Amino acid sequence: MEKMLLKSTTRHVRIFTAEVVDNELQFHPNKLTLDLDPDNEFIWNEDSLNEINKKFNELIKERAGKDLDDYELRKIGSEIEGLIKILLQNGQLSYNPDCRVMNYSMGLPKTNEVL
């Protein structure tokens, strides 16, 4: 069977069955690579990045022994998207005003006027 790189793509999360070698993705059947917020829609701090990475690693461990197929990758991506929304709603993450397009894809920001 031919080696095929699988990927799952949501608006803010891309997951590949690959590893990064010399700045290029190379297929690896037992490794996942996370590309987070490729459009730089959010302003990330170290704590929020650590929380995402921790959740990503937990989700991978939960699936130990399972095939890394499209379905499993989509489930991981969806859970990471959900965590991004929670971080945004809790004020641990904010929209990037210098982003290419401001569309508030995870909902309008909470401000004192809205609360």
Swiss-Prot record:
- Under what name is this protein listed? NAD(P)H-quinone oxidoreductase subunit M
One Pfam family of this protein, by short name?
NdhM
Entry membrane topology: Peripheral membrane protein
UniProt entry keywords in alphabetical sequence: Membrane, NAD, NADP, Plastoquinone, Quinone, Thylakoid, Translocase, Transport
Record organism:
Prochlorococcus marinus (strain MIT 9312)
- One GO molecular function term? quinone binding
Which reactions does this protein catalyse?
a plastoquinone + NADH + (n+1) H(+)(in) = a plastoquinol + NAD(+) + n H(+)(out); a plastoquinone + NADPH + (n+1) H(+)(in) = a plastoquinol + NADP(+) + n H(+)(out)
The EC category is: translocase
Task: Give the protein's function.
Answer: NDH-1 shuttles electrons from an unknown electron donor, via FMN and iron-sulfur (Fe-S) centers, to quinones in the respiratory and/or the photosynthetic chain. The immediate electron acceptor for the enzyme in this species is believed to be plastoquinone. Couples the redox reaction to proton translocation, and thus conserves the redox energy in a proton gradient. Cyanobacterial NDH-1 also plays a role in inorganic carbon-concentration.
Question: What protein family is recorded?
Answer: Belongs to the complex I NdhM subunit family.
Question: For this protein, what is the EC number?
Answer: 7.1.1.-
Q: Where in the cell is it found?
A: Cellular thylakoid membrane
One GO cellular component term of this record is:
plasma membrane-derived thylakoid membrane
Kindly indicate whether the keyword Ion transport belongs to this entry. Answer: no
Q: Subunit notes for this chain?
A: NDH-1 can be composed of about 15 different subunits; different subcomplexes with different compositions have been identified which probably have different functions.
